[in-house]
C-alpha cells in the first residue's frame, strides 16, 4: 500500500532532508537535491535535526509496538493453554512477566548484586564500579549512591529491620552503612586476605558473616566491628554465604564444587554437599512454604517418604540448579535448562516457584512441584548476575553485566 504525503508534508520532508545533508557535510548531494526539489537556499531553524528526531521516534514507537505485541502473544498463549489468567491466579501463583516495568541505568560497570529493602520501596545495587546505588522500585527513580569502597562491591545485605546495610568488596573490606538517616559508612572491618565475595546478617542483627577468596568465612560483631570467629574448610574461593532464617545454621558455596552447612555458634561444618561438577556460584534457603512442593517433587524420584528439610537451592557453573535436604545431606532433584552459568537464585515467597538468573542472559521461573521451567524471560543484553524476589510485594529485580537493574512485575 503506497503512502501518499500531502503537499505540505512533502515540503517539510524535503526541508528536513536538506537540513540533514547540510549538517552532515554532504555539500554536493545537497546542491543537487535543492535543485531537483526546487528548495530555497535559506534553511529554516525549525527543520534543524528534524529528520533524526523523526527517525529515533519511529524506532522508539517500533520498540513499544514490539513490547505490546509480546504482551498480547503471551496473553493469547495463556488463554489457549488454559493457564490461569490474571483474574484466576492467586498472588501465590503470580510470576514475573515481560516486559520489565523499569530498566534503571546509572552504574558504570557490571552489576554484581541486587536486593530489595525489607520494608521500604527501595532496591540496592552493588557494582564493579565500586559504588552502591539506591533506587525507588515503585517509580524507577535513582535515589542516591554510597561511596567508600575502592574496588568492585561484590555483595550487599540488610539486617532484618533494614536499618543497617552491609557491603563487601574486592578491596578486602566489609562496610556497615547507616540506612536510617545519614547513609554514611559507620564501620569498616578488615581481616580477610583476599577479595571478599559475600556478606550476610544473622537474623538477630548482632553479627555479620563474610565469605572470601581467601577460602575462609568470618563472623563479625556489629557493635564493635571485631572478628569473633573464622570458619575454615573450603579448599577454594568461597563464593556466597547465606544464613537460614532461624539463624542456627548457615550455608556457603565455593569454587571447590561443594556447599557446606555450618553451625553458627560453633566452628563446625554440619554437612558437606557434593554433586555439582563445577564452581557453585549461588545458594538460597527455601521458605517453609516450599516444603510441600519440594516433597512432592522429590517423591517422584525416591520413595523415602517425607523430607523434613531445611531445604537449600544451589546454582552452578555446570548450568544446573540442585535442591538439597540439608538435614540428610541429600540432593533431592536437579533442574536443567540454563545454557550457561547459574548466577542467582530466589524463592517465590509462597514457595511454589524458584527464579534463577544466568549468564545465558535469561531469568527462568521453575515450577518446583513439576521440576520444570515454566517461563523464560529474555531479561538482559548481557550476563544476568543477580536476582531477588520481594517478600511482600509482587516484584522481582535483576542485575546484569549490561549495567542495568530491571524491575519485573509479577502477575
Curated annotation (Swiss-Prot):
An annotated Gene Ontology molecular function: dynein complex binding
Coiled-coil residue windows: 56-83
Cellular compartment(s): Cytoplasm, Cytoskeleton; Cytoplasm, Cytoskeleton, Microtubule organizing center, Centrosome
Domain of life: Eukaryota
Domain LisH, chain residue ranges per copy: 9-41
Residue spans of the WD repeats: 106-147, 148-187, 191-230, 233-272, 275-334, 337-376, 379-411
InterPro entries the record matches: Dynein_regulator_LIS1, G-protein_beta_WD-40_rep, LIS1_N, LisH, PAC1-like_LisH-like_dom, WD40/YVTN_repeat-like_dom_sf, WD40_repeat_CS, WD40_repeat_dom_sf
UniProtKB keywords: Cell cycle, Cell division, Coiled coil, Cytoplasm, Cytoskeleton, Microtubule, Mitosis, Repeat, Transport, WD repeat
Record-linked Gene3D superfamilies: 1.20.960.30, YVTN repeat-like/Quinoprotein amine dehydrogenase
GO biological process: border follicle cell migration; centrosome localization; centrosome separation; chorion-containing eggshell pattern formation; clathrin-dependent endocytosis involved in vitellogenesis; dendrite morphogenesis; establishment of mitotic spindle orientation; germarium-derived cystoblast division
Pfam families for the chain: LisH_PAC1, WD40
Predominant location: cytoplasm
Keyword Cell cycle (UniProt): yes
Keyword Transport part of the UniProt annotation: yes
Cellular compartments per GO CC: axon cytoplasm; cell cortex; dendrite; dynactin complex; dynein complex; growth cone; kinetochore; kinetochore microtubule
Transmembrane region(s): none
Family statement drawn from the similarity comment of this UniProt entry: Belongs to the WD repeat LIS1/nudF family.
Primary role: Positively regulates the activity of the minus-end directed microtubule motor protein dynein. May enhance dynein-mediated microtubule sliding by targeting dynein to the microtubule plus end. Required for several dynein- and microtubule-dependent processes.
Domain remark text: Dimerization mediated by the LisH domain may be required to activate dynein.
PANTHER family referenced in this protein's UniProt entry, alphabetically: WD REPEAT-CONTAINING PROTEIN POP1
Protein name: Lissencephaly-1 homolog
Species, as recorded: Drosophila ananassae (Fruit fly)
Organism lineage: Eukaryota, Metazoa, Ecdysozoa, Arthropoda, Hexapoda
Gene: Lis-1
